[in-house]
Amino acid sequence: MLDDCLVSVEWFAVFPTDPQWVPSQDREDAARAVFEVLMGADIEVKVNRPGRVVLEDAGECIETIGCPACGTLVGENPKAMDWWVAQLDRVWTDSGGFWPLDVTMPCCGVQTSLDDLVYDAPQGFASWSVAARNPVYAMGEEMLALVGAALGHPVRWAHRHT
């Protein structure tokens, strides 16, 4: 634990594209096994089943948040994050987490989901994830597809520095 205080820690998380989707135990085990092989030997891997929708965030790596319809920036870190934070507060419940994710964009009035906003760096919402601490390898699209195939559902990712 002392190393957590002395150096930055990276987490690379993979999670289903549907925020409420949770795999069967067999699919979870298969996806974890594939993920562990792809991430490298001796890497700490953890599975998260929080029982509600959580934000798999990019941490301090998040730079901008954009509208998926018109491209307008609605958030820029560290300034101008008020609208996005207010939306997170609005949808949060203790029982469901961040659900429902419906939002009306302030720029163009389009109805969309907080999960569909354009995040730079990538992040999203999930009820299940698998994550590697300080991974040895970067994961490309082909590797993500392998994890998704083992999971039985398409996946996305978030890379967080803490």
Residue ranges and their predicted role:
Residues 122-162:
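Long, contiguous alpha-helical scaffold regions
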Residues 103-104, 113:
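Aromatic/basic-lined ligand-recognition segments
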Residues 1-65:
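N-terminal alpha-helical interaction blocks
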Residues 67-70, 105-108:
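Short cysteine-rich clusters marking metal-coordination/redox-active sites
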Residues 68-85, 93-96:
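Charged linear interaction tracts used for macromolecular binding and regulation
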Residues 85-103, 120-121:
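Short linker/helix segments within small regulatory modules
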